[in-house]
């Protein structure tokens, strides 16, 4: 499995600030590249806090890319993955409701309330990048 890390950061190394507003760093051209990369991958991971704050859908937006995925025998949207300690995510978030994608929630302990909208993977092991990739590979 190939993994790509994509993150927008400010010139001084920040990904966000501590205000309740979303910090916009990316340009429209950046977003075009993000969407192109997204369509070529199997999964996208977003932390629980960005899900709470921004409510992203994390969909493949380009209709031609969606059609290519379906033609290749894939779902039109890539799998969505998140990490949470608390499980404090609303099942009404677009992460869970938008698109035709498999959804995975990783947690270091048992959580309830999301089993009807995602595959919940709870573990007492450390949740490392290797652990996440291994678990996703097991599930296709």
Residue ranges and their predicted role:
Residues 2-139:
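Active-site ligand-binding patch in enzyme domains
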């Amino acid at each position: 499995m190939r993994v790509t890390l994509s993150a927008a950061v400010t010139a001084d190394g920040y990904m966000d600030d501590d205000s309740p507003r979303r910090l916009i760093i990316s340009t429209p051209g950046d977003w075009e590249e993000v969407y192109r990369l997204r369509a070529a991958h199997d999964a996208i991971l977003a932390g629980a806090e960005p899900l709470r704050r921004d409510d992203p859908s994390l969909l493949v937006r380009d209709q031609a890319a969606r059609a290519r995925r379906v033609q290749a025998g894939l779902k039109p949207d890539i799998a969505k993955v998140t990490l949470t300690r608390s499980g404090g995510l609303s099942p009404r978030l677009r992460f869970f409701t938008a698109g035709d994608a498999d959804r995975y929630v990783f947690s270091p302990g048992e959580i309830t309330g999301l089993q009807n909208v995602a595959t919940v993977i709870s573990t007492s092991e450390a949740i490392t990048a290797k652990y996440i990739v291994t678990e996703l590979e097991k599930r296709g």
